[in-house]
Amino acid sequence: MSKKEILQAEKSIALVKEQFSKGLCNALNLYPISSPMIVNEGTGINDDLNGIERPVSFPVKFLNNNRGVVVHSLAKWKRIRLQELELDAHEGILTDMKALRPDEDSSPIHSIYVDQWDWELHIDKSDRTLSYLKNIVRKIYQNLLDTEQKVYEELGIEPILPKKLSFIHSEQLLQLYPTLTPKEREHTIAKDYGAVFIIGIGGKLSNGEPHDSRSADYDDWTTPTEEGYKGLNGDLLVWNPVHDKALELSSMGIRVDKEALEHQLTLAGALDKKSLLYHSLLLADKLPLCIGGGLGQSRICMFLLRKKHIGEVQASIWPEEVRKQAELEGINLL
């Protein structure tokens, strides 16, 4: 890869990131803020994701060797920050999150280095509805469409996203394709519609299994909705023609209130977490109601720029066999 090609690739990545982040702030009324890469261990602020990933942890000399942990994401930290900033309802924050997930599998769409636009929006109690969730998701999707159009104007890459985003609950998806695995269901529905938001991720479905696992203490995946299903969260998927597969771009949702937190901790067998800082603040009604999520920067870049490997849009470490295979296929890892 020539110097000129490298610089052009970096310029294209910067175009996507600048356009998308600016549009997201305008669409959701968000203030860009700084955020930590490291938090104190034992506070409950770092995210468990699906409950089993190990965080990067290390002793800190000036904290008497108490340990710090590199964040998985900032879902809980953002909620505390909303309270500290005393933002009004329908104001929020956007962070440029950098995280490490050492238990992540290596693949063309996975890296141990995670870069996300992590956002959180203060809401009213009356906003804790499926219709409000869908309204926010549509605004995010419109920003994705606008960014795709900008990429077309600047780089000539033809738009492929449908103008309208489809919604489906994970239980409806199970009923449509009862013999398929969750991932196979995602690929099938994304191929059919081009872009889809799957609602209700984390709670058990009629087959006794969740569509995918979710930590019990940030997204609300148990509250009944006006459509007769449970869950106020979901995943945004698009059909990626480069891999001929579905690609998840975002996981997001209305966050638990104290009732949903208590219920979900009970279901998860994790009531011991109630004594942690974040959980005790929430159970004492000291944190704002909110909606939030993460949008994968590298994934959005690789999708809009039609890249085959996430390493073409971010610098990370890879197994030697991955580097060799990339070289054989003419894939230029940064």
Where are these regions (language model features)?
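Class II aminoacyl-tRNA synthetase-like tRNA-binding/catalytic domains
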Residues: 1-110, 118-122
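Generic recognition of stable, solvent-exposed alpha-helical segments in well-folded globular domains
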Residues: 11-15, 19, 128-135, 139, ...
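A glycine-rich phosphate-binding loop feature that marks nucleotide/adenosyl-phosphate handling sites
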Residues: 37-41, 156-162, 201, 321
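Short, Φ-rich (hydrophobic/aromatic) sequence segments
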Residues: 81-86, 137, 299-300, 304-305
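Extended, charged alpha-beta segments that form solvent-exposed binding/catalytic grooves
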Residues: 95-188
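A translation/RNA-centric and nucleic-acid-associated enzymatic feature enriched
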Residues: 98-100, 172-334
